[in-house]
Swiss-Prot record:
Alphabetically ordered keywords of this record: Fatty acid biosynthesis, Fatty acid metabolism, Lipid biosynthesis, Lipid metabolism, NAD, Oxidoreductase
Protein name: Enoyl-[acyl-carrier-protein] reductase [NADH] 1
Species of provenance: Photobacterium profundum (strain SS9)
Site residues, Plays an important role in discriminating NADH against NADPH: 75
HAMAP family: FabV_reductase
Positions with a binding annotation for substrate: 225
Family named by the database record: Belongs to the TER reductase family.
Biological function: Involved in the final reduction of the elongation cycle of fatty acid synthesis (FAS II). Catalyzes the reduction of a carbon-carbon double bond in an enoyl moiety that is covalently linked to an acyl carrier protein (ACP).
Active site annotation, chain numbering: 235 (proton donor)
Pfam families for the chain: Eno-Rase_FAD_bd (PF07055), Eno-Rase_NADH_b (PF12242), Enoyl_reductase (PF12241)
Assembly: Monomer.
Keyword Chloroplast: no
Length: 400
């Protein structure tokens, strides 16, 4: 099949298997070039391992620390007539490349919120690894099917209290728009906490703990974003922020539990990056285009892989074995460079002066678009997209 990008709204409905593999290879090459991770965990579970920060975490563990990895995700495999999702191809590429290096890699595809996912993961750990010493929780799902009732709960990307209006960019037409979003209802806020908060992370860790598959000293980390006053109304001060605060609550509970056996639980606050998740949040594409340009100029720009490698080597698994620096909420802060005052002042000053005419000049908007399409395996110079490719990629994955 010849595969071209098809964009609908803020998602690309096609993915290119060769391009996705190239993306994974690029992240592996970066990790290897940085050198091995000292004190790295050797048996790692990544819940939400098929794209973004979750995929980079699996790569860091495997190719930076020689870890055996189990990945859990919810992706669509390819059919004769339709390509699979980018996450399917990313995971297939990871599996192939890990096995080429003699690394253990197994994957489970299905609803990570379900009891079945947790039980199948436990069974796999018991059968193959015995125990695990790191759990990365990196789910980014807009809906959660409640395991007890089957009820489907949906999250909302809305402000709280009052309607939020701000400059945003229509990424299909490449023009600035005024985006207005009605405030979330109390029910929508509660539902967002249910979907994107810390409940399921707790359920995972408690299930793994009760099954006896967490090794002494096991660390767990879940990913969050706080951002700045530019994005706060829709993010940290919105319904999503309430969910991320619940993640902090869960981290505290889990840290108390795991510290009894020498382990830890932390939220890691990461920088803004181009992901399928962030592209859905109004204001984020424009903010990302601005902040990326300034961070590149300052020499502190990072993508997912760079961030996660820094989290492993300079926070959780430092070469000297010392405890990681944390903020007052016991979070690992990897957004420190993005939040530098000079970088944020630049974005604040620029916000009111950006126009349709200067959008591509004052912000890295073209780079934003390029990175977005690259998530799905497109726009990579070394690939000829007019060549017929095999879409039916199989690998060591079990359906939940």
């Amino acid at each position: 099949m010849i595969i071209k990008p098809k964009i609908r709204g803020f998602i690309c409905t096609t993915a290119h298997p060769v391009g996705c593999e190239e993306n994974v290879k690029e992240q592996i090459a970066y990790t290897k070039a940085q050198g091995p991770i000292a004190n790295a965990p050797k048996r790692v579970l990544v819940v939400g391992s098929s794209s973004g920060y979750g995929l980079s975490s699996r790569i860091a563990a495997a190719f930076g620390g020689d870890a055996a990895t189990i990945g859990v995700f919810f992706e669509k495999p390819s059919t004769e007539k339709k390509p699979g999702t980018a996450g399917w191809y990313n995971s297939a590429a990871f599996d192939k490349l890990a096995k080429e290096e003699g690394l253990y890699s197994k994957s489970l595809n299905g609803d990570a919120f379900s009891h079945e996912a947790k039980q199948k993961t436990i069974d796999l750990i018991k059968a193959d690894l015995g125990q695990i010493d790191m759990v990365v929780y990196s789910l980014a799902s807009p809906v959660r099917k409640m395991p007890e009732t089957g009820e489907v709960v949906r999250s909302s990307l809305k402000p709280m209290g009052e309607t939020y209006t701000a400059t945003a960019v229509d990424t299909n037409k490449d023009v600035l728009i005024e985006a207005s979003i009605e405030p979330a209802t109390e029910q929508e806020i509660a539902d967002t906490v249910t979907v994107m908060g810390g409940q399921d992370w707790e359920l995972w860790i408690n299930a793994l703990s009760e099954a006896g598959v967490l090794a002494d000293g096991c660390k767990t980390v879940a990913y969050s974003y706080i951002g700045t006053e530019i994005t706060w109304p829709i993010y940290w001060h919105g319904a999503l922020g309430k969910a991320k605060m619940d993640l902090d609550r869960a981290a505290s509970e889990l840290n108390n539990k795991l510290s009894a056996t020498g382990g830890s639980a932390n939220v890691a606050v990461l920088k803004s990056v181009v992901t399928q998740a962030s592209s859905a949040i109004p204001v984020m594409p424009l903010y990302i285009a601005m902040v990326f340009k300034k961070m590149r100029e300052e020499g502190v720009h990072e993508g997912c892989m760079q961030q996660i490698y820094r989290m492993f080597t300079q926070r959780l698994y430092k070469a000297d074995g010392t405890a990681p620096e944390v903020d007052e909420e016991n979070r690992l802060r990897l957004d420190d460079w993005e939040l530098r005052e000079d970088i944020q002042k630049h974005c604040r000053d620029l916000w009111s002066s950006v126009t349709n005419e200067n959008l591509f000049e004052v912000a890295d908007y073209q780079e934003y678009k390029d990175e977005f399409i690259k998530l799905f395996g497109f726009g990579i110079d070394s690939i000829d997209y007019d060549i017929d490719v095999n879409t039916l990629i199989e690998f060591d994955v079990e359906s939940i």
